[in-house]
Amino acid sequence: EKLPPTIGYLTIDFPNTGRSSIQNLAGKNLDNLVDAVYEILKKLNISDYVLCVHSLSGILACKLMNKDFNCQALVAIEPTTKKVMFADFSKNPYPEMEKQMRLIEEFGPELYFKNLTQTTFIPEINKEIWELMQEKGSELECQVPGFQVSVEITKEDFEDVSITDRIPVFIFCQAYREKEYRESEYWTANTKLILGGNHHYLQWSESEKIVDIIKKL
């Protein structure tokens, strides 16, 4: 609703989430997922696009941009870094992240997430989101033992990952993660950090700022 009608957009859900189909991802890795997204872009003849990614999609975007050169910019919302993906939080946790994890533990993941969606969306949209999530959850519960929900991601996936300086990179993150991103695989001479928010789902709380950047691009 916040993007002008002249801007087209394509949303790709991870397998086994959102509106994507249910499939066993045993034996599948991140490169397989990158190839699948690349095939979608080719099939739809999409060129000159801006990648908007959240969390684990960040590392997928890095690999995709090395494969497809039509990306004009990357807007990354708290993309996953190698430092956090494989960190030992028992030794050196972020106090702020620890506080969020305590809230999730105290209220339970579902109630914590429901509070966020209720704050963000009108009741009709919020109801639709939760009906979809519950439907997907029920489908996943019916799968056979050994069913793998997500692709395997290893330390090797983060090796030799880089982004060319020609692509503008905009990273939305909470203030306490600034240093992490300045030292991460997403940092180039053409990277800009936008600090704000107090949870991981900044695509909701910072949506106006994200739209402003997309319009300018």
Outline where the language-model segments fall.
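Catalytic histidine-centered segment of alpha/beta-hydrolase-like enzymes
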Residues: 198-207
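Active-site loop/turn elements of alpha/beta-hydrolase fold enzymes
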Residues: 14-16, 79, 174
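Active-site loop/oxyanion-hole signature of alpha/beta-hydrolase fold enzymes
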Residues: 11-50
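Short amphipathic alpha-helix adjacent to the substrate-entry channel of hydrolases
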Residues: 1-10
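Flexible "cap/lid" loop of the alpha/beta hydrolase fold
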Residues: 74-107
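Gly/Ala-rich beta-loop-alpha elbow adjacent to hydrolase catalytic centers
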Residues: 52-57, 61
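Conserved serine/cysteine hydrolase catalytic core
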Residues: 122-197
